[in-house]
Amino acid sequence: MSSIYLDHNATTALDPRVLESMLPWMQRQSGNPTSRHVFGRSARDAVEHARTQVAEACGAYASQVIFTASGTEANNFAVKGIAGNQAGSQILYSAIEHPCVSRPARAMQQAGWLSDAIGVDAHGVLSTAQLQQQLQKPTSVASVMLANNETGVIQNIAEIAEIVRKAGAFMHTDAVQGLGKVPVSFTDLNVHAMTVSSHKIHGPQGAAALILDKRVDIQPLLHGGGQERGLRSGTENVAAIVGFGAACELAVANVAQFASHTQMLRDTFELGLKALDVTIFSQQSTRLPNTSFFALDGIEGETLVTALDRKGYAVASGSACSSDSTEPSHVLLAMGIKPDLARGAVRVSFGAHNTLLQVTDFLTTLKNEILRLKQLTGVAA
């Protein structure tokens, strides 16, 4: 039985065209990009071409792109690096941030910084009133994600950034889930720093970037040979960076088609969900077109995910980076969802290659598995 992949917010398959662009840097002798000979110069040219591709995809300048190995690394770099070059004050982050933002913010408390979470409403939208109140304390940096990896809710980052800027703080956004699904512009978002990642847009794992306003004073992430403007030393992963650049170019070219196709699949799916007596989260908010997050009373999300996996459907019970946790989704708890319902949460995230037939077949399987699990629960009770 072949499995149907419905977990594209966790990671995506490598596009064959991206792999083709990477192969020369994996199969042939290539130089260190810092070397002066022809092999090194060729590698440097490839890295700089990819930097331009990433910049153009993000509405930024190539000089603002700093390559990292992951979105987690870029987010840690932004939070710790920006705060670290200022006097100990406050770091703010939304209550629905990925752990790779919230945990480094809290870790900075050991070095004398304060950290605090900005609340969201019942639909997953950030409270700007609370943000303004919290900004009355001296603040180094505020980090609010563009689009949530679980609910898909899109924040009004430009408005939030203006509030943060007026308070004299720096603004960072994790745009990992937004790139390739909705138009993303570093300039239009009005932020000082922005994170994007390769493996969410059919590029290779092991490549990401922090887009950084050059006027921001930030501590280096890694000290060494001085690569990436002296901010992230270490020999560049040329093949992965080349792949990231190619993936960015393809993602931007296809973003409108991706959005219309996946929203059609999601709308069809959620119409079918309504007949199954489930709770769909954040339906009233602006969301990523491909993402649906729902829950059933009385059925654990992990149990349903495992059951669906056995039937050939790959979905998630929340963030892939916290899938080893048995705790309810922190995103749903921040939205005021009761823990018992939050434990039943399941995320479906569609991709460009999913089909309407797959959606209708999945709905049939989902209905059958829900009925089966309810019967088992009834017997157990």
Task: Locate each region found by the language model.
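Pyridoxal 5′-phosphate
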Residues: 1-381
